[in-house]
Amino acid sequence: MQNNKFHYCLHILPILFFMAFVSASCIKDDQGDCPDPGTPSTPGFSLEVKAFDADGGSLGDETIKDLTLYIFDADKALLDTRNVLLSETVTLDYPGHDNLTLVAWGNGKQGAQSMPALKEGNHLETAFVSLIQTRTTLPVAGSPDDLFYGTIDITSAADASAKEFPLRRKVSGVAITARHLREYVGSTEGEYYYIVRKTTDKLDFYGKPNGTEVSYRPQAAFNDNGEFVSPAFNIFPTEADIKIDIYHRDVLKTTVIADSNGNPLRVAEGRLLNVLVDFQGAVNVDISVTDWGKQDIWKEI
């Protein structure tokens, strides 16, 4: 009887060892699906994208027609691109990435500028918003859309509760009126036009000017009062002074570089620069800076 028990134990031991091995393998496999404890990961982080004017006033989706969010990792390599809505709560969850850089552009898809076609892994510094050139001889570009821009950095220490991600206007506005221009030139025939100089033709994803210099040829026409008027149009922001060339039949007639008090023509993001050039008698130039969309109505003196 003792001998039978001994043989029974010998037979059962291999089975027990096999079961222990299988159990250990299952536990190991289960752990393999879990994140490595040594790899940091950003917990789900929520934010709301909001838009503001130059004075901090809140703007709605009647102003922001489209909104694209670009998510970059700690090395500024693209992780993801998402189309979102204004004031939508956006949750970001990218395991293994404890630092993120977010860049958002509003109205970039409205067609008056070229947005970058980024792929996963592309570096932030290779991304640009570019003007569409309409003429290469100067060169001349078309007016961009009402662009908005914002950027924010997220770290592993950031509060996971919803955070505000602000966007602000990333273009400047210009409106030009010329009085008694035909009398000054001495002709009612032929084409008149403005050339506005200069900005760069690109904005990078830091929101800074980049690229090469470009000019603008805004739409303009004579109104019923004989004033040559260019309604408000957009240009890329610039810290340099701008200049306005006035042409007739492709011949430069004059260049406006400052007002009558010597103040240079300067634009500001989210503001409208109004310029009045009066050619009656001594040439007089007035300028004013107004809120976005509020073009100055010049009174006849």
Language model feature labels by segment:
Residues T255, N263-G293:
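Phox homology (PX) phosphoinositide-binding domain
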Residues E48-T63, T177-G186:
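Structural motif
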Residues H97, A157-A160, D224-E227, V267-L272, ...:
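Solvent-exposed, conformationally flexible loop/turn segments
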